[in-house]
């Protein structure tokens, strides 16, 4: 089977193109696509590290270097949760809020561009197919034999 015969090939190629474009644009603002995504998902009332890890698809411990970098850049600060002192929440600094707005604007403009070139019916069909692929992936059991 050739890579072009698999669905995941096209998913990866399309996402890689999107991520590369976001990185190219984000670098002009001194951030990366991943940092922009994290900034967009940090809420005014703070966001738990575990929530961010889930969104990024990584373990909480894997985020420590990225969060440290974001602190050093002055984008975020950490604070123990008032209700559960064992839990740490991430908050945006004023500079982080500025960069979050930039990231949101970049995403909005890029999606406006895509929507100008992809019709409503095509977009809805794509979303439906991607949702179906996601569900099938979650349901898939390869049934390995030992």
Q: Residue locations for each model-derived region?
A:
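Charged, amphipathic alpha-helical coiled-coil/dimerization segments
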Residues: 19, 69-128
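Amphipathic alpha-helical interaction segments
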Residues: 9, 13, 37, 125-128, ...
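Short, locally clustered residues in the helix-turn-helix/winged-helix DNA-binding domain
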Residues: 15, 40-44, 104, 131
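N-terminal helix-turn-helix DNA-binding core of bacterial DNA-binding proteins
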Residues: 20-62
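N-terminal leader segment of winged-helix/HTH proteins
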Residues: 1-29
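C-terminal regulatory/oligomerization modules of transcriptional regulators
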Residues: 1, 121-146
């Amino acid at each position: 089977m050739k890579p072009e015969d698999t669905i995941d090939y096209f998913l990866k190629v399309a996402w890689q193109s999107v991520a590369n474009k976001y990185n190219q644009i984000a670098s002009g603002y001194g951030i990366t696509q991943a940092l922009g995504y994290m900034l967009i998902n940090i809420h005014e009332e703070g966001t738990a590290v575990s929530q961010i890890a889930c969104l990024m698809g990584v373990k909480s411990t894997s985020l420590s270097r990225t969060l440290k970098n974001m602190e050093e850049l002055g984008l975020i600060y950490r604070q123990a949760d008032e209700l559960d002192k064992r839990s740490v929440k991430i908050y945006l600094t004023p500079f982080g809020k500025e960069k979050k707005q930039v990231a949101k604007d970049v995403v909005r403009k890029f999606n406006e561009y895509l929507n100008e070139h992809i019709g409503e019916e095509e977009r809805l069909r794509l979303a439906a197919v991607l949702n179906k692929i996601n569900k099938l992936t979650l349901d898939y059991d390869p049934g390995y034999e030992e």
